[in-house]
Amino acid sequence: MPIVFSATNEVLDPILAGVVKGNQDKVVGWLREESGSWGFLAGQAVSAVRKEAGRDLEDMERRLVWSRMWWWLEQVRDRVQAAN
């Protein structure tokens, strides 16, 4: 029986945390509004979730991944701003 993948925050968050941690240079680039940073991170997020799901993501799933990845980046930005 195939494993069902559910794109919920509980499932996505550990995956996306790994994307943030593994691509800190691009996260800094995103914070600096460097061209291409968001696209790179969005692509890495979709790729990581697709690998975990074991299949291509549906359009709505990709949009959920992008939205949650953006949320993660906003959390990083807010923490950096609060520290300064």
Outline where the language-model segments fall.
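N-terminal non-cleavable signal-anchor helices
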Residues: 20-21, 66, 77, 81
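N-terminal acidic leader/helix
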Residues: 2-47
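Short, charge-rich amphipathic interface segments used for partner binding and complex assembly
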Residues: 40-75
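Short alpha-helical "patches" and their helix-cap loops
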Residues: 7, 60-64, 84
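Short intrinsically disordered terminal tails
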Residues: 1-4, 80-84
